[in-house]
Amino acid sequence: MKGGFSLNSELQLEADAVIIGSGAGGASVADVLTAAGLYVIMLEEGGHVPSSSASPFASEAFAAAWRGGGLTAAIGRPPIAYAEGRCVGGGTEINSAIAQRADSDLLDQWRKLYKIENFTPDELSQYYGRAETTVNASLTPGPLGRPTDILRLGGEALGWKVSELKRGQRDCKGANRCSFICPNGAKQSMAVTLLPKSMDRGMRLLARTRVDKIRIEKGRAAVVVAQLQDAGGQGVHVRVKAGLVFVCAGAIHTPALLRRSGLRKRIGDTLRIHPTIRATALFDEPVDAHQSRLPLTAVTEFMPEQRIGGSVFTPAVFGLSLAEDWTNRGDLMQAWRLCGSYYGMIRPRGVGSVRPLPGINEPLVSFKLAPEDWISLGQVLTLLGQAMFAAGARKVIPSISGHEGWTNPDEVDEFRNKPLPEKATNLMTIHLFSTCPPGEHRDACAVDSYGRVRGVENLFVADGSVIPEAPGVNPQMTIMALAFRIAEAALSHSSRERAQSAARE
């Protein structure tokens, strides 16, 4: 390959374009730019973890590929744990690779509300198609395992719509290590698909390189200032000059970087997530979820506002989930083969914020749920409990500290149309969006309809930050679709700019 994952000690670099972040957004931008013949430098804060060296142990895998080792949370009542990838390939290395498009009605709603140009479902369809082709979005052949059957049987018994989920995969072996980096390269993450392709075209990727700031001069992003950690653990200062700059560091670190660079207008003020409540279902017969793929069906009857699905299950991950209330839940560890882990997620009305802190790498993240979000969480938890009992569960234990669990279907009505207890409820999310909403509604949007940061001619955002609101589905396909679209628009914008400059000369 012409590019590479290796570190480099050069201090002064120049390129046609620099991309900050190597996840779904950054890799998609790189694919467009390198195909157009541009010389691209990509900067990634995390390291490269090849499939061949991916650890099967949760503690090692989290430390290698997850930001903060998986221990990150948004401040609020309650704090909400969230997950981000921090490695070459970003979140695509640790997610479930589920491939879904955002609802067409929702896309139209965003187009009108934020005044986003050329944003109809038909106009976005080509980009979604490109994303799906890239990752080979497909149904998983063969038996899917009892965890999947449980969710399907429960939903169908209640007369709900249940959908089998497409995933980005080729010849999945069912290792059940999606969250730990796929050990055989079957999951079609960015490190398997687009990044090698872009590097073959000459892209240079610097791993373990944290970007500190972007220097803005005369309305342009002039220099990207970063620090690379070399093989000996020493820091090396790096400065990159490029005609085009793309920030693709995710919905948390993109706004943090922009604000550190002096760009604050409507940036980092509108964080959206998918608040998620989990429940453990205990059955009389072994589920052996650790031997199966994560559940590959979802209850889609109530989408896009609410969705019910299943989680990756290993003994270690299950133990971590019980640790939130070990006094009352620890005994379930002895029955772990009889257990399955499921969740309900919602599209919230509440919003959060992202603020960088002086001298600290991690920004301050906060999120406040709206009152109606608590009602919605109570509803989706009720639905989840109903589905588990309909599938034959003996007991369902919601992720609420001190809760004794339900032992029959009648008990799950406890929170029907009622708010969950704020202090005791344990929430999490793996989906983060909307900190740089796009559009021509200048009072609401941080970037224009094509991802360009207002007031900076050559600076673009192309990651989950530009999904206008929570989409109610796994976001990878939407991130990739928008990144393809933004990269194409940036090339067109750059061509027009060069032509205008030549005309002036």
From Swiss-Prot:
Requisite cofactors: FAD
Name used for this protein in its record: Uncharacterized GMC-type oxidoreductase y4nJ
PANTHER family attached to this UniProt entry: LONG-CHAIN-ALCOHOL OXIDASE (PTHR46056:SF12)
Annotated family: Belongs to the GMC oxidoreductase family.
Highest taxon of the lineage: Bacteria
InterPro entries: FAD/NAD-bd_sf, GMC_OxRdtase, GMC_OxRdtase_N, GMC_OxRtase_C
UniProt keyword terms in alphabetical order: FAD, Flavoprotein, Oxidoreductase, Plasmid
Keyword Transferase: no
Enzyme Commission numbers on file: 1.1.-.-
Pfam families: GMC_oxred_C, GMC_oxred_N
Residues annotated as catalytic: H431
Record GO terms (molecular function): flavin adenine dinucleotide binding; oxidoreductase activity, acting on CH-OH group of donors
Organism annotation: Sinorhizobium fredii (strain NBRC 101917 / NGR234)
